[in-house]
Amino acid sequence: DFNNDGKPDFVLGNHGLNSRFKPTDGSAVRMFVNDFDQNGSVEQIYTKQSGDRHIPYTLKHELEKQIPIVKKRYLKYSTYNKESLEDIFGAEALSNSVVQEFNFASSAVMMNKGAGKFEIQALPRKAQRSWMFAALVTDVNGDGIQDIIMAGNLEGAKPEAGQYDASY
Protein backbone atom coordinates (compact mmCIF):
# COMPACT_ATOMS: atom_id res chain seq x y z
CA ASP A 1 0.00 0.00 0.00
CA PHE A 2 2.28 2.76 -1.29
CA ASN A 3 -0.17 5.64 -0.79
CA ASN A 4 -1.58 4.48 2.58
CA ASP A 5 -5.17 4.33 1.29
CA GLY A 6 -5.77 0.82 2.65
CA LYS A 7 -5.79 -0.84 -0.79
CA PRO A 8 -2.97 -3.16 -1.92
CA ASP A 9 -0.75 -1.79 -4.68
CA PHE A 10 1.62 -3.85 -6.84
CA VAL A 11 5.26 -3.70 -7.94
CA LEU A 12 5.66 -4.69 -11.61
CA GLY A 13 9.13 -5.91 -12.53
CA ASN A 14 9.94 -5.46 -16.20
CA HIS A 15 12.70 -5.18 -18.79
CA GLY A 16 13.87 -1.66 -17.92
CA LEU A 17 15.04 1.06 -20.29
CA ASN A 18 18.78 0.34 -20.52
CA SER A 19 18.47 -1.86 -23.59
CA ARG A 20 18.41 -1.99 -27.38
CA PHE A 21 14.75 -3.00 -27.07
CA LYS A 22 12.98 0.35 -26.83
CA PRO A 23 9.27 0.12 -27.47
CA THR A 24 7.32 3.34 -27.88
CA ASP A 25 3.61 4.08 -27.99
CA GLY A 26 3.61 3.91 -31.78
CA SER A 27 6.17 1.15 -32.23
CA ALA A 28 6.15 -2.04 -30.20
CA VAL A 29 8.98 -4.56 -30.11
CA ARG A 30 7.63 -7.67 -31.80
CA MET A 31 8.66 -11.31 -31.74
CA PHE A 32 7.75 -13.38 -34.80
CA VAL A 33 7.63 -17.14 -34.20
CA ASN A 34 7.51 -19.51 -37.16
CA ASP A 35 9.34 -22.33 -38.91
CA PHE A 36 10.76 -19.79 -41.36
CA ASP A 37 12.98 -22.27 -43.23
CA GLN A 38 10.48 -25.17 -43.12
CA ASN A 39 12.93 -27.57 -41.45
CA GLY A 40 10.64 -28.64 -38.59
CA SER A 41 12.31 -26.34 -36.05
CA VAL A 42 10.58 -23.17 -34.85
CA GLU A 43 12.56 -19.91 -34.82
CA GLN A 44 11.88 -16.63 -33.06
CA ILE A 45 12.98 -13.27 -34.39
CA TYR A 46 12.71 -9.95 -32.52
CA THR A 47 12.01 -6.83 -34.55
CA LYS A 48 11.63 -3.08 -34.23
CA GLN A 49 9.25 -1.17 -36.43
CA SER A 50 10.35 1.37 -39.03
CA GLY A 51 7.28 2.73 -40.80
CA ASP A 52 5.40 -0.38 -41.91
CA ARG A 53 8.56 -2.53 -42.00
CA HIS A 54 9.80 -4.88 -39.27
CA ILE A 55 13.58 -4.65 -38.89
CA PRO A 56 15.28 -7.62 -37.18
CA TYR A 57 17.26 -6.99 -34.00
CA THR A 58 18.93 -10.33 -34.61
CA LEU A 59 22.45 -10.03 -35.99
CA LYS A 60 23.16 -11.74 -39.32
CA HIS A 61 25.56 -14.33 -37.91
CA GLU A 62 23.08 -15.24 -35.15
CA LEU A 63 20.16 -15.61 -37.56
CA GLU A 64 22.13 -17.73 -40.02
CA LYS A 65 22.95 -20.19 -37.20
CA GLN A 66 19.20 -20.83 -36.95
CA ILE A 67 18.36 -20.40 -40.63
CA PRO A 68 21.34 -21.29 -42.86
CA ILE A 69 19.69 -19.96 -46.06
CA VAL A 70 20.25 -16.44 -44.69
CA LYS A 71 24.02 -16.93 -45.10
CA LYS A 72 23.61 -17.82 -48.79
CA ARG A 73 21.10 -15.06 -49.48
CA TYR A 74 23.01 -12.29 -47.70
CA LEU A 75 26.76 -12.59 -48.14
CA LYS A 76 27.47 -9.17 -46.59
CA TYR A 77 26.26 -7.59 -43.39
CA SER A 78 25.67 -4.35 -45.29
CA THR A 79 23.08 -6.06 -47.50
CA TYR A 80 21.36 -7.85 -44.59
CA ASN A 81 21.24 -4.68 -42.47
CA LYS A 82 19.06 -2.92 -45.06
CA GLU A 83 16.44 -5.67 -45.14
CA SER A 84 13.17 -5.99 -43.26
CA LEU A 85 11.70 -9.27 -42.09
CA GLU A 86 9.23 -8.97 -44.98
CA ASP A 87 12.17 -8.72 -47.42
CA ILE A 88 13.99 -11.70 -45.91
CA PHE A 89 11.09 -14.16 -45.58
CA GLY A 90 8.16 -12.71 -47.53
CA ALA A 91 4.74 -11.50 -46.43
CA GLU A 92 3.22 -15.00 -46.35
CA ALA A 93 5.75 -16.28 -43.80
CA LEU A 94 5.01 -13.30 -41.59
CA SER A 95 1.24 -13.69 -41.90
CA ASN A 96 1.63 -17.34 -40.79
CA SER A 97 3.74 -16.36 -37.78
CA VAL A 98 2.67 -16.15 -34.17
CA VAL A 99 3.39 -12.55 -33.18
CA GLN A 100 3.91 -11.34 -29.62
CA GLU A 101 4.69 -7.73 -28.75
CA PHE A 102 5.59 -5.50 -25.87
CA ASN A 103 5.16 -1.76 -25.76
CA PHE A 104 6.00 -0.86 -22.16
CA ALA A 105 9.48 -1.75 -20.87
CA SER A 106 9.60 0.22 -17.60
CA SER A 107 9.40 -1.38 -14.20
CA ALA A 108 6.49 0.27 -12.43
CA VAL A 109 4.03 0.34 -9.58
CA MET A 110 0.35 -0.32 -10.16
CA MET A 111 -1.70 1.85 -7.84
CA ASN A 112 -5.04 0.43 -6.74
CA LYS A 113 -7.70 3.11 -7.22
CA GLY A 114 -10.50 0.83 -6.01
CA ALA A 115 -13.51 -0.65 -7.82
CA GLY A 116 -11.19 -2.67 -10.07
CA LYS A 117 -9.38 0.43 -11.37
CA PHE A 118 -5.57 0.69 -11.42
CA GLU A 119 -3.06 3.30 -12.51
CA ILE A 120 0.43 2.36 -13.69
CA GLN A 121 3.29 4.68 -12.74
CA ALA A 122 6.78 4.01 -14.08
CA LEU A 123 9.48 3.91 -11.42
CA PRO A 124 12.22 6.58 -11.53
CA ARG A 125 14.91 6.38 -14.22
CA LYS A 126 17.46 4.90 -11.78
CA ALA A 127 15.16 1.89 -11.38
CA GLN A 128 15.21 1.25 -15.15
CA ARG A 129 18.91 0.35 -15.46
CA SER A 130 18.29 -3.39 -15.68
CA TRP A 131 15.60 -6.04 -15.51
CA MET A 132 13.67 -6.40 -12.28
CA PHE A 133 13.20 -10.05 -11.34
CA ALA A 134 12.31 -9.58 -7.68
CA ALA A 135 11.34 -6.80 -5.30
CA LEU A 136 11.03 -6.34 -1.57
CA VAL A 137 8.77 -3.56 -0.29
CA THR A 138 9.79 -2.29 3.15
CA ASP A 139 10.52 0.95 4.98
CA VAL A 140 14.31 0.85 4.74
CA ASN A 141 15.12 4.15 6.48
CA GLY A 142 12.26 4.36 9.00
CA ASP A 143 10.64 7.46 7.47
CA GLY A 144 7.18 5.86 7.22
CA ILE A 145 7.36 5.66 3.42
CA GLN A 146 7.54 2.28 1.70
CA ASP A 147 10.75 1.71 -0.28
CA ILE A 148 11.38 -0.85 -3.03
CA ILE A 149 14.51 -2.98 -2.98
CA MET A 150 14.93 -4.41 -6.48
CA ALA A 151 16.87 -7.45 -7.71
CA GLY A 152 17.79 -7.83 -11.34
CA ASN A 153 20.59 -8.37 -13.84
CA LEU A 154 20.87 -10.98 -16.56
CA GLU A 155 24.19 -12.05 -18.00
CA GLY A 156 23.10 -14.84 -20.37
CA ALA A 157 21.53 -12.63 -23.04
CA LYS A 158 22.39 -12.93 -26.74
CA PRO A 159 25.12 -10.62 -28.07
CA GLU A 160 22.66 -8.38 -29.91
CA ALA A 161 20.91 -7.64 -26.61
CA GLY A 162 24.01 -7.22 -24.45
CA GLN A 163 24.36 -8.02 -20.77
CA TYR A 164 21.80 -6.61 -18.38
CA ASP A 165 24.08 -5.96 -15.43
CA ALA A 166 23.73 -2.27 -14.66
CA SER A 167 21.88 -2.59 -11.36
CA TYR A 168 23.49 -3.24 -8.01
Predicted regions mapped to residue ranges:
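Beta-propeller-forming repeat regions
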Residues: D1-Y168
